[in-house]
Amino acid sequence: MKMMDANEIISFIQKSEKKTPVKVYIKGDLKEVTFPETVQAFVNKKSGVLFGEWSEIKTILDGNSKYIVDYVVENDRRNSAIPMLDLKGIKARIEPGAIIRDHVEIGDNAVIMMNATINIGAVIGEGSMIDMNAVLGGRATVGKNCHVGAGAVLAGVIEPPSAKPVIVEDDVVIGANVVVLEGVTVGKGAVVAAGAVVTEDVPPYTVVAGTPARVIKEIDEKTKAKTEIKQELRQLNPEK
């Protein structure tokens, strides 16, 4: 998996068409209304649903007020530069409510839980779980077979573009409500205790805790047993 360069992301956002997509329920004498090809119209003679850019649909509503007697607008963004990731081809378990921007890479058999938020340029390795309400900022990178606990934050770095993003290496367990600041690398096999604030690199195969986080011991068999990654949670249905 390739991490996006910050300048690539900045250029993508700068050049992207800023959009305000809406979904509009309408009713009225709709056989008298003409809809342009740029608006998706699923209508019959009396009611229907429109999908499209707000500026275009508003023109339709204003110009046909004598035919459209009522409407309701659903709108969740304004001048948005980054679309949501198309999830249909992702070989991972992604639960309802996860917010995942375009240009995010998700490895096979990863798990993204409810209300996780993953920003552009983030990378999630094979078999890693991003738990409920966790936040992965821009370009944050998580290796293979990791667990990022509920409410944890991996700080994002898009600007300044020279800044180093958070890197979590393979087989890492990050506890609930941990904050990992930009530029930090969490070494392979490490464990970050719940609630820690990580301001410096974490050595491989160590346990860190506290604010700021400090090494409290090396990984031992007891720690391994308490932080075991369960592959059963990452299994998908056999492909048909």
Swiss-Prot record:
Family matches, as InterPro entries: DapH, DapH_N, Hexapep, Hexapep_transf_CS, Trans_hexapeptide_repeat, Trimer_LpxA-like_sf
Molecular-function GO term, any one: tetrahydrodipicolinate N-acetyltransferase activity
EC number: 2.3.1.89
The keyword Transferase is assigned to this record: yes
Full protein name: 2,3,4,5-tetrahydropyridine-2,6-dicarboxylate N-acetyltransferase
Keywords per UniProt: Acyltransferase, Amino-acid biosynthesis, Diaminopimelate biosynthesis, Lysine biosynthesis, Repeat, Transferase
Function as written in the Swiss-Prot or TrEMBL entry: Catalyzes the transfer of an acetyl group from acetyl-CoA to tetrahydrodipicolinate.
Pathway in which this enzyme or protein is active: Amino-acid biosynthesis; L-lysine biosynthesis via DAP pathway; LL-2,6-diaminopimelate from (S)-tetrahydrodipicolinate (acetylase route): step 1/3
Organism of origin: Bacillus thuringiensis (strain Al Hakam)
Segments crossing the lipid bilayer: none
Recorded catalytic activity of this chain's protein: (S)-2,3,4,5-tetrahydrodipicolinate + acetyl-CoA + H2O = L-2-acetamido-6-oxoheptanedioate + CoA
CDD domains: LbH_THP_succinylT
GO biological process: diaminopimelate biosynthetic process; lysine biosynthetic process via diaminopimelate
Pfam families: DapH_N, Hexapep, Hexapep_2
HAMAP family in alphabetical order: DapH
Family to which the UniProt record says this protein belongs: Belongs to the transferase hexapeptide repeat family. DapH subfamily.
Signal peptide region: none
